């Protein structure tokens, strides 16, 4: 990247920003994928932005990066793209990009994006927020969950993020997995990536309202719902309204008084699933 002629151009010193793209799929040929390239694709957009910043610093330039188009690993056909659920993969990259870029671009919908290509292949170089009839695609809900996050970081590990904000807490769990999207229809293969969790939070005295948002293949993913309406004519307006209602993360709310001020979670997450727990002390609700 440092050898790119752009970084030797005197025009760069006059620039107000640097526009760029980062598509993890440009690393891969799904027909002959190898484990090393697959692993490198996991955080490719974030790593590419870091390299750009490094190249700019070497030339004593501080330019905001505008990430106009980007994508994580995904399938290159309608079926493999739809079946390859990647909520956690998208969230990991959003969290990593937040302090690397000034803006990240999205298409409003897949029609404007021009996603469908020739021979049944998809253009995987960018992301669209919606599908047909305004149906939310997975990245829409990942952004929705990401925008809920606020406060200071208490713990930030690979698959766990704990935030604190004026006595409120948020716990974000991710089961980030990369594998060949062509294998997304192999249920036995997918199940091997399920991840058990055991988390204990201390110091939660009193009574709390706990909201649990779950986003996985069965709670919020659009493609499995769409499959129920596969026909030559496609869904009608009533069915589109039903899809709009169903294609969202699950929400469960409880009120708990943790024993000995300790709250414990024992659960499991499917491949690339996301779970966000939000803790609100009930004395704040008065």
Map each language-model feature to its residues:
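Conserved, mostly hydrophobic/aromatic
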Residues: 18, 97, 143, 212, ...
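C-terminal beta-sandwich/jelly-roll accessory domains of carbohydrate-active enzymes
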Residues: 174-286
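Noncatalytic carbohydrate-binding groove/subsite architecture in carbohydrate-active enzymes
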Residues: 1-100, 104
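Flexible, active-site-proximal loop/turn residues at the rims of small-molecule/cofactor binding pockets
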Residues: 24, 110, 281-283
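A structural signal for well-ordered alpha-helical scaffolds and beta->alpha junctions
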Residues: 45, 49, 90, 136-140, ...
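Extracellular and analogous surface-interaction loops
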Residues: 7-8, 163, 200-205
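Short, solvent-exposed beta-strand-terminating loops
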Residues: 26, 104-113, 215-228
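Aromatic/acidic polysaccharide-binding cleft in carbohydrate-active enzymes
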Residues: 67-187
């Amino acid at each position: 990247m440092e050898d790119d002629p752009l970084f030797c151009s005197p025009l760069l010193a006059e620039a107000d920003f640097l526009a760029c793209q980062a598509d993890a799929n440009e690393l891969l040929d799904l027909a002959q994928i190898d484990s090393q390239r697959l692993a490198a694709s996991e955080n490719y957009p974030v790593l590419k932005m870091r390299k750009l910043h490094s190249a700019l610093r070497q030339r004593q330039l501080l330019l905001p990066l505008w990430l106009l188009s980007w994508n994580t690993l995904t399938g290159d056909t309608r079926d493999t793209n739809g079946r390859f659920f990647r909520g956690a993969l998208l969230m990991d990259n959003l969290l990593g990009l937040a302090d690397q870029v000034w803006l990240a671009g999205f298409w409003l919908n897949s029609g404007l994006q021009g996603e469908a290509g020739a021979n049944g292949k998809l253009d995987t170089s960018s992301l669209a927020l919606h599908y047909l009839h305004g149906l939310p695609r997975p990245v829409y809900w990942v952004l929705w969950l990401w925008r809920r996050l606020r406060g200071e970081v208490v713990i930030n590990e690979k698959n766990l993020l704990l935030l604190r904000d004026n006595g409120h807490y948020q716990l974000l769990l991710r089961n980030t997995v990369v594998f060949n999207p062509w294998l997304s229809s192999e249920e036995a293969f997918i199940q091997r990536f399920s991840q058990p969790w055991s988390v204990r939070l201390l110091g939660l005295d009193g009574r709390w309202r706990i909201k649990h948002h779950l986003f996985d293949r069965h709670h919020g993913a659009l493609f499995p719902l769409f499959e129920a309406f596969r026909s030559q004519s496609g869904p009608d307006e009533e069915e589109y309204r039903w899809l709009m209602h169903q294609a969202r993360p699950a929400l469960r709310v409880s009120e708990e008084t943790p024993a000995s001020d300790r709250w414990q979670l024992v659960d499991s997450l499917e491949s690339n699933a996301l779970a966000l727990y939000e803790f609100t002390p009930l004395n704040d609700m008065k």
